């Protein structure tokens, strides 16, 4: 379930990520998102690795901070992509107190044992301007709720119109079927006259 949520998240936030070159893993950092967990601010960072090594090979994904230390992160994959390649994910959650100690963040990947590491550009997480852009404002959430409500009302109206169309179609079919089942009107011929006129 978590992997599905992350794939949806990346599909919405990173719709134009470049792919790897000649089967070389290519790590990309998604824009960080600020969440409230138990009343505390946490920054979620996701690293998407395209053209990762298939299962069975030692393909690593990890994060490092500005001081060069590796950070504990959750990794998912590799998962098959529609184009036949493999994709891996790395997820890192940092509290607001840890941001300054670990930034800038870098995502690293290594295709196999002895392979060359590939890294992303450093990602700065703190800063007044950047944090405003990454935090989901309440007005945005309210706007999303309004859009969901409008979409639900529109779906309800379309469903009612569909039911009305089905009802009218069924009524018409019943009328036509009833006409076909009625016996044809009997044509009674007048009895032949036995009276002969004498001339």
UniProtKB/Swiss-Prot annotation:
Using the UniProt annotation, give the residues that carry a glycan (glycosylation sites): 67, 117
Q: Where are the transmembrane segments?
A: 156-176
Question: What is known about what this protein does?
Answer: Component of the pre-T-cell receptor complex (composed of PTCRA, TCRB and the CD3 complex) that has a crucial role in early T-cell development, particularly alpha-beta T cell differentiation.
One Pfam family linked to the record: PTCRA
Q: Please provide the record's keywords in A-Z order.
A: Cell membrane, Disulfide bond, Glycoprotein, Membrane, Receptor, Signal, Transmembrane, Transmembrane helix
* Any one GO cellular component localisation term in the record: plasma membrane
**What InterPro entries has UniProt attached to this entry?**
Ig-like_dom_sf, Ig-like_fold, PTCRA
Where is the signal peptide, in residue numbers? 1-16
Q: Cytoplasmic compartment: which residues?
A: 177-199
Q: Could you tell me what this protein is called?
A: Pre T-cell antigen receptor alpha
Assembly state and interactors?
Heterodimer with TCRB; disulfide linked. This heterodimer assembles with CD3 proteins into a signaling-competent pre-T-cell receptor complex. Interacts with RHBDD1.
Which residue ranges are assigned to the Extracellular compartment in the record's topology?
17-155
- Cite the Gene3D superfamilies for this sequence: Immunoglobulins (2.60.40.10)
Tissue expression = Found in CD45+ but not in the CD45- fetal liver cells.
Give compartment(s).
Membrane; Cell membrane
Segments carrying the region annotation (Disordered) are: 117-139
Cysteines engaged in disulfide bonds, as pairs = 47-107
The alphabetized list of GO BP terms reads: alpha-beta T cell differentiation; negative regulation of thymocyte apoptotic process; thymocyte apoptotic process
Q: How does it sit in the membrane?
A: Single-pass type I membrane protein
């Amino acid at each position: 379930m978590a992997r599905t949520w992350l794939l949806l998240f990346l599909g919405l936030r990173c719709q134009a990520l470049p792919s790897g070159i000649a089967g070389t893993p290519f790590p990309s950092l998604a824009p960080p998102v600020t969440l409230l967990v138990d009343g505390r601010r946490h920054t979620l960072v996701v690293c998407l690795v395209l053209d990762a090594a298939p299962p069975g090979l030692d393909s690593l994904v990890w994060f490092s901070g500005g001081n060069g230390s590796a950070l504990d992160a959750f990794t998912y994959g590799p998962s098959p992509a529609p184009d036949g390649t493999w994709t891996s994910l790395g997820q890192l959650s940092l509290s607001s107190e840890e941001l300054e100690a670990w930034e800038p963040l870098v995502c690293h990947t290594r295709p196999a044992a002895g392979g060359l590491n590939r890294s992303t550009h450093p990602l700065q997480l703190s800063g007044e301007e950047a944090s405003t852009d990454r935090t989901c404002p309440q007005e945005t959430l309210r706007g999303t709720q309004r859009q969901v409500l409008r979409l639900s009302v529109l779906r309800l109206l379309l469903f009612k119109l569909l039911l009305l169309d089905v009802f009218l179609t069924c009524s018409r079919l019943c009328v036509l079927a009833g006409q076909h089942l009625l016996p044809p009107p009997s044509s009674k011929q007048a009895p032949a006259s036995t009276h002969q006129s004498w001339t």
